[in-house]
Amino acid sequence: MDLSRIPPQPKAGILNVLIEIPAGS
């Protein structure tokens, strides 16, 4: 998981990303 790949966003948005994108990606 690379936080640098996703733009800054609310924590709720980050949670959604974590759910949509497997940690292994």
From Swiss-Prot:
Enzyme class: hydrolase
Cofactors: Mg(2+)
Catalytic activity: diphosphate + H2O = 2 phosphate + H(+)
Record's GO cellular component terms: cytoplasm
Subcellular location, record wording: Cytoplasm
This enzyme's EC code(s): 3.6.1.1
Swiss-Prot/TrEMBL keywords: Cytoplasm, Hydrolase, Magnesium, Metal-binding
Any GO molecular function: inorganic diphosphate phosphatase activity
Coiled coil: none
Annotated family: Belongs to the PPase family.
Function statement: Hydrolyzes PPi generated in anabolic reactions.
Name used for this protein in its record: Inorganic pyrophosphatase
